Design a protein with these regions (language model features):
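Adenine nucleotide-associated cytosolic modules
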Residues: 1, 6-217
Length: 217
């Protein structure tokens, strides 16, 4: 059955058919994101897609901190943050989303406050818990377009990998050790996954934590 458009949009609307009004950026958003909009590959349509995007960050530490701020500044509309830690003074040398004023606070709430102060367009969904096999399905069920993996341990990285493959969610994976850093994008079913490259974690002595081996701020 094909409905008639005779009578135009007014009749279509009056008859109760579905419709969607075109969305436009507000004047404030056009000003805030003007440097994005000037890029032909982005424009207003691309900026609207960023505002509609949902990104889940695993960790609000040395990797998650700058990632969260730049994603928020870019106008990614919804950021989920998973972290069970609290802000410690040893974090402040590199975890720039936190501050002296938030020492002792849960990292997810400290990050939420900073992100919302930076860009009120962004909604922050805090998960004050460590990602585990018991909660990963619940968290991913909230619907995420991309996962940013800034975890500081291998069990979590493998868990993120396995869940992302199952749910077909791309993962941006970051890691750092002292002066070295790595960034990799894993797109499930479009290329190899993290476990494909590293079937098992390295022995602990080859992968010390930041607390054990240090890290540049």
């Amino acid at each position: 059955h094909v409905s008639s458009m005779a009578g135009g949009f007014a009749d279509w609307k009056r008859n109760g058919y579905d419709f969607e009004l075109p969305r436009a950026l507000s004047p404030e958003q056009r000003s805030r994101y003007s440097r994005h909009i000037l890029i032909p590959e982005v424009g207003e349509e691309g900026q609207q897609r960023l505002l509609d995007a949902r990104v889940l960050l695993i960790g609000a530490g040395g990797l998650g901190s700058p990632a969260s701020l730049y994603l928020a500044a870019a106008g990614v509309g919804t950021l989920g943050i998973v972290d069970a830690d609290i802000v410690d003074d040893s974090n402040l040398q590199r975890q720039i989303v936190h501050s002296t004023n938030t020492l002792g606070e849960p990292k997810v709430l400290s990050a939420k406050r900073a992100i919302e102060a930076l860009n009120p367009d962004v909604t922050v969904v805090p998960y004050e818990e460590r990602l585990t096999s018991e909660n990963v399905e619940r968290i991913l069920a909230d619907g995420w377009d991309v996962i940013v993996d800034g975890a500081d341990n291998f069990p979590t990285r493998y868990l993120v990998n396995d869940a992302s493959v199952w749910h077909h969610i791309p993962v941006v994976h970051g890691s750092i050790y002292r002066f070295e850093g790595q960034v990799t994008v894993f797109h499930p079913h479009a290329g190899p996954c993290y476990r494909c490259l590293y079937p098992s974690p390295p022995p602990p002595e080859l992968a010390p934590s930041c607390a054990e081996g240090g890290v540049l701020g």
